Design a protein with these regions (language model features):
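Extended hydrophobic/Leu-rich segments
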Residues: 1-2, 193
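Redox cofactor-anchoring modules in respiratory/redox and cofactor-processing assemblies
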Residues: 3-137
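Small-side-chain structural scaffolding
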Residues: 39, 51, 88, 103, ...
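Short pre-active-site segment immediately N-terminal to redox-active cysteine/selenocysteine motifs
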Residues: 50-53, 144, 174, 184
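Iron-sulfur cluster-binding cysteine motifs and their immediate structural context
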Residues: 56-62, 140, 150-167, 180-193
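N-terminal pre-triad scaffold of radical SAM enzymes
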Residues: 138-144, 170
Length: 193
């Protein structure tokens, strides 16, 4: 992760930022991307691609992934953030190959550059980018809902309650957070928090 737009794009500068150059690709992200989820995505790839020869890569990356899954599912703790950093550094220093040594980079660089997003996931149980489903809550604004029943009819979990021509509500215990209701609402009465 490179937070500063003015960072020169060369091997040494990227390495100093905790990133790397080699594949010739670069991904630009904005506030609609969850950095915790992005680091989880890259770590998931690493876990799948690991040859399994060395313990830091084989076991360590699985533990990192488990912690990231906990965090994106709203079950993470502040201790997990410390453990991510500590374990990531151990893997980086002790893995035997280039894949293993660079595998914790997405976690370490997002922790370094976007620590506040990790804290929001853990303490506030929120994802500012609205990417982590477990941390989302769908609500219906009663002032905008006219009770057209479109969301009610299309909810696959039967989580929407309400009579025709009266404001509806979403039962958060039944809601599977699929977004179908929001996609169907023509009155923009459904919000994600």
């Amino acid at each position: 992760c490179i937070r500063d737009r003015d960072t020169p794009i060369d091997f040494d500068n990227l390495l100093a930022e905790g990133s790397m150059m080699g594949s010739g690709g670069m991904i630009v992200m904005d506030e609609d991307d969850c950095m915790v989820s992005v680091s989880r995505f890259y770590l998931d790839f690493t876990v799948e691609e690991s040859c399994g020869k060395c313990t830091p890569c084989r076991i360590g990356n699985k533990r990192l992934l488990e912690m990231l899954n906990k965090i994106t599912e709203g079950r993470g703790t502040m201790k997990d953030l410390d453990a991510l950093s500590t374990l990531g550094k151990v893997i980086k220093d002790t893995a035997l190959c280039g894949l293993g040594q660079t595998s914790p980079n997405p976690v370490l660089s997002t922790l370094n550059n976007f620590y506040d997003e990790y804290v929001e996931h853990v303490r506030d149980k929120t994802c500012r980018a609205k990417q982590c489903k477990a941390l989302l809550t769908y609500t219906i604004n009663p002032e905008l809902c006219i009770g057209c029943h479109l969301c009610f009819k299309h909810c696959p979990a039967d989580a929407i309650l309400g009579d025709v021509r009266k404001p509806h509500v979403i039962n958060p215990d039944k809601c599977i957070k699929c977004g179908m209701c929001m996609a169907r609402c023509k009155f923009k009465a459904i919000n994600v928090v």
